[in-house]
Amino acid sequence: FRRSAYKLFDANLLYTPWNKLFSRAYVDERGLRFPQTFWDDFPFVLSVIRDVERVAVTSKQYYHFMRARAESETAAYRSNMYDKREEEHGWMLDLYAHWGVQDEASMEMVARRYVERLVGCVENVTNPRCTLSKEGKRREIAKIIGGEQARKCLKLARPRSAMMKAILLPIKWNNVSLTMLESRVVSKVNSSNTKLFATLKAKR
């Protein structure tokens, strides 16, 4: 499971609690609970799979879920989003270090996951609801795309779509102005056509 986990991450099967059947006994024995934080599902799932050595994958559907909230968390501006993504990346690195798995395919997935979410961090800054000044936005974006992890992961990541390759170019070039311009377009699509945005996001 551990050496193939990158495939399940890429198939979006290891991020959220749904699409899974957990052993209640396993969860209770280890005292695993959802942490008191926003985006609490991801750290919970990581805590469950941390010491798991085998999983079973089935094509059958055993339950359905419904989710409803007043506002999508992906559409809201969050001043600490970048810090949260940095924290998540640390969790992924820690998980793979704990597993003793450092092969090229796994590390590429971890790096690609990180840089794809950097795009979201930049879009968060160009979001119309962002309260930063124009110069404040430039400074924040410069910090995001020029960070140590960003530069390292951009070298390791191999985007799977032409769209994502194109989106990452300004970030690779460390070009703040072009990155901001591109991100404003993304923000516009996100705010005006959420269905199109979700479709494009799914095809990244």
Where are these regions (language model features)?
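Catalytic core of nucleotide-sugar-dependent glycosyltransferases
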Residues: 60-69, 75-101, 120, 124, ...
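Amphipathic alpha-helical repeat scaffolds of TPR domains
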Residues: 109-123
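Inter-helical turn/loop segments and adjacent helix faces that build the functional surface
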Residues: 34, 99-105
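Membrane-interface aromatic/basic loop that binds lipid-linked glycans or pyrophosphate carriers
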Residues: 127-204
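Residues within HEAT/ARM-like alpha-solenoid scaffolds
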Residues: 83, 87, 105-113
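Alpha-helical structural motif
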Residues: 1-4, 88, 114, 137
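Donor-binding/catalytic cores of nucleotide-activated saccharide
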Residues: 1-81
